[in-house]
Structure formats: C-alpha cells, structure tokens
Amino acid sequence: MYTKNDIMQMVEDEDVEFIRLQFTDIFGNMKNVAITSSQLEKALDNRCMFDGSSIEGFVRIEESDMYLHPDLDTFTIFPWRPQQGKVARIICDIYRPDGTPFEGDPRYVLQKVIKQAEDMGYVFDVGPECEFFLFNTDDNGCPTTDTTEKAGYFEMGPNDHGENARRDMVLTLEDMGFEIEASHHEASPGQHEIDFRYEPAMHAADNIMTFKLAVKTIAKRHGMHATFMPKPKSGVSGSGMHINMSLRKDGKNIFADENDKFGLSQDAYYFIGGLMKHIYEMTAITNPLVNSYKRLVSGFEAPLHITWSVRNRSPLIRIPSAVGGGTRIELRSPDCAANPYLTIALCLAAGLDGMKNKITPPENIQKNIFSMSEEEKAERNIKSLPTNLSDAVEAMEQDAFIQDVLGEHISNVYINSKKDEWDRYCRAVTQWEVDEYLDKF
C-alpha cells in the first residue's frame, strides 16, 4: 500500500516530470488528465477537477464539475517514455463536488459488488486471457487489416512476424509489475495472446486497461497496429477475453472440493448456476459491439450456447483441469471491447446471486456442442446467446438484476447509446452489400 509521501518520494527519486491521471468511461475507453510533478500534491489531495460533460455518457453541462481521486496503489512509471523527465500514471476514481462517488464511474460499480463479496468474507480473483491482432500500417501510419504472415497456433519466428513485438510487450508489462505466465501466437494469422497472473478483481480490471494501452503502444513502436476488435476479418477466428474466476475465503479457494467427481464445491456449482441464469442479459456488456456478434458464430471455436463443461472447450463455461487451489470457472464469451470493470462486476454479481439463491446449473455437457443436431439441443434445453447487439440490448433493458448492478445512470446511458449504435449500423451501406448486389440489380 502506497502512501501520499511514498508517491511524492518516488516521483522525486525517479525524475518523474509528468503524471497521467487515468480513468475509464462507461464504454471502456481510457481517458486521462496529464499534470506536471509540481501539481502532484494537489492531485493526491483529491483537488484535481475535470469537465465531466466532455466525456460521453458522464453528465450534462450544467452539472459537469468532477474530481479525480487517485488510487495510490496504481502508481506506475511508463517504461516506454523518456528516462529523463519520466512519465507515470495513477488510476483514479471519479467523485462529485459534494464528495460522493459518481454513479457513472465503472470502477465504482465494481467497488460496490466487491464490497458485497467482502461482506460475505470472499475475495474474488480474476485471470483474463486477452487476444489481439497485429496488423500492418499503411504509408501514412494508419491501421489496416493486412498481415503478411500465415502463422497459426503456437507458431514461432520466422513464420510469426509479430514475435519481436510480442516479446517487447511482455518485457514492458513485466517492468510495470505484471506477472506474465505465457505468450503465444493464436489461431489466426496476426493473432496473439499474452496471459498474466490472476489478481483480485479490481486489480485485474485495472490490469486489463493497462495491458491494452501497453500492447497498442509497443505495437506502434514496431510499425504495427494492435487491435482488440473482436472480429476484424471474415473467415478467421475472432479475439476473445476469457475470464477465469475463483473465490477465496480465509485464504482458501472455496470452489475446490476433492471429494466431488469434478473437483467442484457446491458453491462452485451455484456460482455456475448464477452465471448461466444471467449471461443472456449480461451479453450486451460482455460483448458490446455490433462486431462482437460476428465472433460468436459457429466454426471458429467461439461459444454460442449457454452450457457448461469440464475441460470441453465448446460450451460457454468451462472448468479447466487444474484442481485444488487452481480450481476456477472460465467464462469464454466476453471480448476485449468490453468494459472490464462492468464485465467483472456482473460476473461476480451473477455468481453471488447463484450462491445466495442456490441456483443449481443444468447437467454439464461433455459432447462437442457444434456436432449436435438442433433436435438434440432442443431435447437438452440448450439455449443460445444473443445473435446480435440489438437482441442483447433488448434483453438487458428488460432485466432488473443487471440494471440494479450497473445502476440507473450507467444502464440508461449504455442502453440508449447501444440502440443508437445498432440503428447507425442498420442504416450503413456496407462493402459486402456493394459487392453482393451492385452488378446484379
């Protein structure tokens, strides 16, 4: 735990000249206010103000004053910036002038759900698996969807053209305090994954935001563009953000039970039941873009069906083979376009709801779901996730549980914005339509 004096001393000792006060908007976009070291004490006293009306989804212009409250434990120095006059960052919570937390701050939403878990004696650990593409840029440095490689799963150089960039990403992340467990080339040409160690929920969400910034920054230094867009190209696997979850109580993983045939405790089953009950209505948050649903299609290992399994990778929820302290629940539908604070908050809230109300999940599915007929899926009562953003938003709009977790402000802003996004998509004339119809009609 850092103190104010710790931060002031580190800034002086490390020759830090600029500090970025970072925060995240409702839609998962990172924002910042940059200050010089001369203004740091003011910022650490929670006296740094910004115009909230300028941030999409925050507040109206007549109530725009907002204050940034730095979370001191998020202080880190950017390794890629100059080593004289260094640049550091601190992630901030957003408060109103009257000293109350701003209900539109995604971090505040997660804090509230974490508090519920803590009141029950639990620590929620989260380990994300973030996938991304590295593409070439054009002569002007603008991103393209072009890649000159044809590499697939676990390939290495020289076939993996992003190997050097990925190595530098790993080294940079380690300099920033990440514990990197593995990195590798993914299934599609130009696609990569870097896995970092699980952390308590808030730290994990902060890490996802930091991870995306670092990956994009290092890619640019290698003359490439990193994108977390779920499905940037047709005909290849999209990029997901699998969420691995476990609960600890008194230092012990409460999901583990060595006497169960699958190694799962009753609370783990209830947690799975809660996730399965709420996932359809959560999907507008976990998969927030029109493009997200082009990843969630058959033929590319993406989960479509609301089922669970042990080891089998075709269902929505998977129980990896690790046992004991490593026992965890893996939710496979989210993608990296999702706001990690809202996504993790909903995962925890849904799981706790399952535990509180003893929601028993259906029988697990060991068979490859993609090989099942529609009749067999109907017989087993296997339901599917929403197939498009419109259906997902409609489900969210009708669900009181999701809106209660997110709060009225975020729910209303998010739903209205996503309705507008869908409407703009429906009105757009795409290149596919031009290619398909122009010379036929």
Segment roles from a protein language model:
Residues 1-441:
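Glycine-rich, acidic/polar active-site loops that bind/position phosphate-bearing ligands
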